[in-house]
UniProtKB/Swiss-Prot annotation:
This protein's name: Heterogeneous nuclear ribonucleoprotein A1, A2/B1 homolog
RRM domain: residues covered: 17-93, 108-185
Compartments where located: Nucleus
Function: This protein is a component of ribonucleosomes.
């Protein structure tokens, strides 16, 4: 079986060295994208995704650094402006995570499960401050008994610490393993209500990012046009029909949501004294959806991107991208319809 998340000489898998770059100007090329981001380290792969027929930019791309710490350096240097336009870099996620609806969510709040009775809120602050500025840490307790319910929420001043924390599953506090997931507000599940006529994450009336086909943005996504940050925003208070990626070129946004089917909620809940009992939704947040939605049946992450061959920079790509459906002009974005691959 081919390892699609290749490690470098330092044992760092590809996804921890890769950034997705959204909101690109239609003029941005591989070279200009590389020229900007190589300020923070050696880039071994870069690609601006283009429509295979028109050869116009879809408004997003990927860069892969030689070392993981270079991703940290680039993220710490935000905001980034490429070719006169502020772009939105986001950490890549492993391909195995593509079935998780929260994988691409942009939130500042973290759900922490597996909280033991001896753990205190200061323990959470002390542990997670290595990732960024902790705004608040709250262990949820039973309103009547005041006993800890086994989970907590930690909020940061930025979304990137949450992304980085969720890329690692090996977190321990006081020698005990804890579970971490992005805390999504109730009602912000992908799928569910039907999408609008505005385009998916690529403009037009094409599918959302995901869908039931094995392509980026298959036509099954988001009820006729899932959007990234459209009428049903992922992040607290953001979106709402505005706040879209890609701007005037069709960009990321519009319509409904990311795409795919199932909603948040199902599965387990951290409830009563730390035990589990039915639906992960707690205190207004969904901690970890169990059903597919984001990405549908597709097994590669948005962070996987255009995977190069073993020769690295300039090799052949193996990741499928859809080439049908409507596009978002110069701004473009993930996803536009159809089934063919190239």
């Amino acid at each position: 079986m081919v390892n699609m998340d290749r490690e470098n000489d330092h044992g760092e898998p590809e996804h921890v060295r890769k950034l997705f770059i959204g909101g690109l100007d239609y003029r941005t090329t591989d070279e200009s994208l590389k020229q900007h981001f190589e300020q923070w380290g050696e880039i071994v792969d870069v690609v601006v995704m283009k429509d295979p027929k028109t050869k116009r930019s879809r408004g997003f791309g990927f860069i892969t650094y030689s070392r993981a710490h270079m991703v940290d350096d680039a993220q710490n240097a935000r905001p980034h402006k490429v070719d006169g336009r502020v772009v939105e870099p986001k950490r890549a996620v492993p391909r195995t995570e593509i079935g998780r609806p929260e994988a691409g969510a942009t939130v500042k709040k973290l759900f922490v499960g597996g909280i033991k009775e001896e753990m205190e809120e200061n323990d959470l602050r002390d542990y997670f401050k290595q990732y960024g500025t902790v705004v608040s840490a709250a262990i949820v307790v039973d309103k009547e008994t005041r006993k800890k319910r086994g989970f907590a929420f930690v909020e940061f001043d930025d979304y990137d610490p949450v992304d980085k924390i969720c890329l690692s599953r090996n977190h321990q506090i006081r020698g005990k393993h804890i579970d971490v997931k992005k805390a999504l507000p109730k009602g912000d599940a992908p799928g569910g209500r039907g999408g609008g006529g505005r385009g998916g994450v690529g403009g037009g009336a094409g599918g959302g990012w995901g869908g039931g086909r094995g392509d980026w943005g298959g036509s099954a996504g988001g009820g006729g046009g899932g959007g990234w940050g459209g009428a049903d925003p992922w992040e607290n208070g953001r979106g709402g029909g505005g706040d879209r990626w890609g701007g005037g070129g069709g960009g990321m946004g519009g319509g409904d949501r990311w795409g795919g089917g199932g909603g948040m909620g199902g599965g387990d809940r951290y409830g009563g004294g730390g035990g589990r009992s039915g639906g992960w939704s707690n205190d207004g947040y969904n901690s970890g959806p169990q059903s597919d939605g984001f990405g549908g049946g597709y097994k590669q992450s948005y962070g996987g991107g255009a995977v190069r061959g073993s020769s690295g920079y300039g090799g052949s790509r193996s990741a499928p991208y859809s080439d049908r459906g409507s596009r978002g002009g110069g701004g473009g974005g993930y996803g536009s319809g159809g089934g063919r691959r190239y």
